[in-house]
Amino acid sequence: MESSPTRTEPAQPRVPPSAINADYDLSTPIDLDGVGLRQKLPSYGDAHFSLFMRKLFIKALGYSEDALSRPIVGIVNTYSSFNPCHGNIPQLLDAVKRGVQLSGGLAIDFPTISLHESFTAPTSMYLRNLMSMDTEEMIRAQPVDAVVLIGGCDKTTPAQLMGGISANKPIIHLVTGPMMPGSFQGVRVGACTDCRSNWAKFRAGAMDIEDISALNEELAPTAGTCGVMGTASTMACLLVALGMMPIHGATAPAVSSARLRIAEATGTHAVQLARQKQRLQPQAILTRESFLNAITVLQAVGGSTNALVHLMAIVNRHPALAGTITPATIDAIGRTTPLLLDLKPSGDGYMTDFHAAGGMPALLHHLRPLLHLDARTVTGRTLGEELASATASTLQSLYVDSPSSSTKRIIRPLTDPVYPSSALVVFTRGNLSPGGAAVLKASASKDRRLLHHRGKAVVFDGPADLAHRIDDPALDVDRDSVLVLRGIGPVGRNEEEEKGGGGGPSGMPEAGLIPIPRKLAAQGVTDMLRISDGRMSGTAGGTVVLHVSPEGADPGSVLGVRLLSVELEEEVIKARMEERRREMELKEEGKEEGWAARERMRGYRGLYVREVNQAEHGVDFTFLTAAGPGANGKDKGAEQAGGDVPPGYSFPKLRWIIQHSPMVIILQSPMVLCITDPEGHLF
């Protein structure tokens, strides 16, 4: 006779009914500053009813009272089918949730904006601040005890940290990780340093159309961020240096099992953050020393020039630190910090090489004498404590302490650097960028002779003018010329808007890597001194000065002058000055009418042009900074820049002096960037 199957009793809830019912006990006030579901209740005028409504709707998703009683870890989900840098986020989400649940928390993911460089017009930088607002308000509004910020692509991690600092709830970062390199004709290639170098070969006629098409299939063979020391990888390294991401989190490839284990560990850390009685919030973790560590790492890895703008935006979100770190700080630290990492675009390796060589723990081990090891981290321990634990591991014994390690060529010791100092040079002196934000990635210069250079300026008024004239055989340019592109700053001078086409601001695009004129490229010229008020990709190389401030859209900028006639004889100048002033003021009035019209724009475009500040302040919206809307940082750059200028010289507010030539640009690295007439007179 068969026995009847054993009846399984339903599991008893871990939360006793009395505790459940307490949520509806009208005689007991609800702690609105509590944890879990009881925080940040919507306003229905009755807190008990608000909690009642919240619970009934979340239970529609199948959550039990046991689940809802746990600390809630929010997970920011930036997956998008338009964003291949974030293509592995579904797998990372599962791993983070596993870590949260194994540690006794409740993981709930929610979406925010997702930005990719190639799929946002006019540029992803234009939307970085919008993403930071989205991140801040979703963290602030929702009942989360800690938040995991999953991101990776260039503007994502800065936007998330900016928003996270402003919301000031416990946060921890998880990056998607770098992609793997590909292979083309037996040579390793990867996005996107090799994109640009090979495109330059194609423009010069050294590569045919079949090869460039075949190469396109190999440059980005997997999901993940660019596999060189571009902006995404730079910001990942800086998150570790700032203490906002665990020490092993920066370099594991996007498609590796190591990346999934890092994600699971991040979930565990997030629950620890959520359970702490004294919440470890970003404003408590981040100190001036944290930012000094980040800048040291920025210089040591030969990081992206874009990191300068992002760091300024991040620090100026912090109420206690805003204004204490400036571009001049980056320059000062660079003078005593060597470049240790041999990765493209400053060197030859890829992020997979960096990871195999020990990643950030190995690099920080070499940098110990230059770091503030007492800086706090998101784990609750100091950077020194984290580093002591990491360097004791087998991995570090293999890669750092072994004198025979072949990977030592990737991470150099302080005594044998790739570049002695100032991988990133910030021009704090000179009249071309009195805002003090102009930056040059000296370590990525292809012709070091250009670091001390004097040449005639060839000026382009925006991307359309550049595209129209750069390859014109009649262009008056030679290998010693200085290519200048203006009108691509934070606001920019949008050609469509000026033509009445309704275009918006430029958004500071990555157009600063001005292509070598084709007729010079065909002669073997691979680098020229180039200057712009825009940005360039962190994966790019060349002798390129970026972020000139004030930008060309500002009539007071040296780059902002629109028509040029420089008279070399003083008596001629005196005789014609009044006539020219009247003529140019009439022309400028017409231009300023267009400018005023842009300031009346509706929607996000209007918000952007009215509120965005300049590069030295982070290209953030003034009302989002810690100082708030009453402290517009647009005009503080010259005060911060300091430096030597001729006695009695004041930065000009010129409306009537400009020309494509004969302006002369003088670059004296790492000190001075000036614009003069052919006789050497400063404008």
Predicted segments, located by residue:
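Catalytic or ion-coupling anion/metal-binding cores of large enzyme and transporter domains
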Residues: 2-5, 13-85, 92-112, 118, ...
